[in-house]
Amino acid sequence: MENTVIHVQADKGQYTITAIGMDQAFRRLIAFLLETRLMEDRRLIFLTDGAVNIRDRIERFFAFREHTIILDWLHLDKKCYEYMSMAVKGTKAEKDGMKRTLSSILWTGRADKAIKFLNGIKKKSIKNDRKLNELKDYILRKSPVLTCYALRHELGLKISSNRVEKENDLVVASRQKHNGMSWSDKGSGALAIIAAASRNNELDSFLVNKQIRFRLCA
């Protein structure tokens, strides 16, 4: 099992949760949300990279409460760009134009219009039918977790989970994945917990009193 990192943001505060294994991380997330009362009169929004195992955990652990899952915009845009690069042909300007058109459609979260656009690509512009169909399947699968990214962006709301990736780098990756270092699950988890406690401004409390405050930090 690997370290799982969850980053919570509410109002102007934040908190980093880490655990060995996704199930344990989600249990700690629920404990944190209950302790801080962040599930009271609030809308829960999960920004993810679209991984099925993450979505399954969210649906399982939060089945008791209304929530929203949003696919990370950067991940969606990159994935579609890669598929389009393999699926279409033409001059650079023509290919870039098709990619921009698809991106602008998905920016507003309209999966049905995106599929209609892809279906309308002329045969002479198709390089690989299989990749084009895979792109359509991908968009259809992800349609339940697409949103109007343009509106969220305009309102100053989050459209990407890149902050989680940054926290993962700070808590896990930068300390454990370089210099050919090898870690046991126990050692890796312990180091990640210490790093997270430091990020949460509760390292002294954790080391001296063996206590975690479970409070948002600035």
What is each of the regions a protein language model found here?
Residues 1-218:
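Catalytic center-proximal scaffold of phosphoryl-transfer enzymes
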